[in-house]
């Protein structure tokens, strides 16, 4: 759970910004989006292999990371 300590005299906006940043670092929103709809393990595995293939193609492109 993301928690933020509020200092004396700190505005709501700055506390809210800190909270949003801590949620982003913890990966809470991405986890919620991932769990929003059930995804079969076979579909998850297929997406993972497609992403790995895309990364491999990107790495093998000429001029990448010379």
From Swiss-Prot:
Top-rank lineage group of the source organism: Bacteria
GO BP terms in the entry: translation
InterPro entries noted in UniProt: Ribosomal_bS21 (IPR001911), Ribosomal_bS21_sf (IPR038380)
This protein's GO CC annotations: ribonucleoprotein complex; ribosome
Keywords assigned by UniProt, alphabetized: Ribonucleoprotein, Ribosomal protein
Signal peptide: none
Pfam assignment, any one: Ribosomal_S21
An example molecular function term from Gene Ontology annotations: structural constituent of ribosome
HAMAP family: Ribosomal_bS21 (MF_00358)
Protein family membership: Belongs to the bacterial ribosomal protein bS21 family.
Protein name: Small ribosomal subunit protein bS21
């Amino acid at each position: 759970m993301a928690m933020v300590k509020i200092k004396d005299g700190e505005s709501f906006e700055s506390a809210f910004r800190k909270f949003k940043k801590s949620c982003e670092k913890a990966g809470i929103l991405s986890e919620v989006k991932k769990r929003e709809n059930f995804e079969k393990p076979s579909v998850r595995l297929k997406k993972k292999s497609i992403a790995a293939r895309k990364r491999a193609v990107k790495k093998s492109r000429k001029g990448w990371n010379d």
